[in-house]
């Protein structure tokens, strides 16, 4: 059974790894006390092909499971799949908080001028897309403008660009006010 190692009082204790112009945060989020699997939130900023000079990066995040010997168990790109492992709703909230904190660490370290992100799984339900909006809020809070831009073959695309000042948008206001879904 999954045991979350993140507590409400914990600050994100993770180092930003940097190499080949990529920035990575790998945060331990828990373990399975029956089979020994360890679970990490893996968050990466990688330069878009041909755009390194412009400081435009792609952001991706997932949950990765591995055995202590290093053998790979699985990678979960969205909540519809990770829910089978991380069952407790409170644990899921803590993990999402760790992902957002890791995104903030990467933005602070890389200082990208532009960021692009897309859903990994096509046709995600509204509840799953709201998590991307939560990650989007990290960008907005750090001085980026943007949000969801288009829908392509079931994938939602997001684009952000650094602006001179932090947005005055209320945290409760939808990022795309003209979108009836609010996301």
Task: Indicate where each model-derived feature is located.
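Non-catalytic substrate-recognition and accessory regions of acyl/acetyltransferase enzymes
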Residues: 1-183
């Amino acid at each position: 059974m999954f045991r979350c190692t993140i507590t409400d009082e914990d600050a994100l204790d993770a180092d930003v790894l940097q190499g080949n112009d990529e920035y990575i945060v790998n945060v331990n989020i828990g373990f399975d006390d029956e089979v020994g699997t360890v679970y990490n939130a893996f968050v990466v900023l990688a330069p878009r092909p041909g755009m390194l000079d412009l400081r435009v990066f792609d952001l991706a995040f997932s949950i990765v499971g591995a055995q202590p010997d290093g053998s790979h168990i699985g990678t979960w790109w969205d909540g519809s799949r990770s829910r089978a492992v991380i069952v407790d709703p409170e644990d899921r909230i803590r993990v999402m908080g760790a992902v957002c904190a890791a995104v903030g660490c990467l933005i602070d370290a890389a200082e990208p001028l532009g960021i692009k992100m897309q859903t990994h799984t096509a046709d995600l339900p509204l509840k799953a897309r709201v998590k991307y909006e939560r990650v989007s809020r990290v960008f907005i809070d750090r001085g980026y403008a943007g949000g969801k831009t288009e829908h392509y073959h079931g994938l939602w695309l997001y684009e952000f660009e650094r602006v001179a000042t932090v947005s005055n948008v209320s945290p409760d206001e939808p990022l795309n006010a003209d979108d009836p879904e609010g996301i």
